[in-house]
């Protein structure tokens, strides 16, 4: 029995090291004001609830909403061009799953090129 306890105690630092580096994601902001505009194209995003994406700066408590993945990625590549912080400050990117419409972390999503399904901007 003692042997098993020591094995667990020896593995514990390894497990902590593996998972400690992974930052916990906060929940996405779910409330979008009716007058909220996409910082990239200027469209009203609340009209396109199924396509809304968001970028969050948790340190500054700021959220930017977009009318689709395309504008989210344009913003992510050069956020300062659209009034955002440096790219390293964008801690979270969120998109909606196409079928369930639930928020998922954008870095975990699978994106399809050449689909016949178009978002609000084509």
Please state what every model-predicted region is.
Residues 85-122:
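Thiol/selenol-based redox catalytic cores and closely related redox-interacting motifs
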């Amino acid at each position: 029995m003692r042997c098993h306890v020591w094995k667990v105690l020896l593995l514990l630092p390894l497990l902590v090291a593996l998972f400690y580096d992974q930052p916990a994601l906060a929940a996405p902001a779910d409330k979008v004001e009716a007058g909220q505009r996409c910082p990239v194209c200027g469209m009203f995003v609340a009209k396109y609830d199924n396509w809304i994406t968001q970028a969050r700066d948790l340190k500054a408590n700021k959220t930017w909403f977009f009318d689709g993945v395309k504008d989210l990625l344009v913003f992510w590549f050069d956020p300062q061009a659209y009034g955002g912080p440096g790219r390293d400050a964008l801690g979270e990117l969120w998109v909606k799953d196409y079928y369930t419409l639930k928020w998922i972390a954008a870095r975990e999503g699978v994106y399809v090129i050449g689909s016949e399904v178009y978002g609000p901007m084509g």
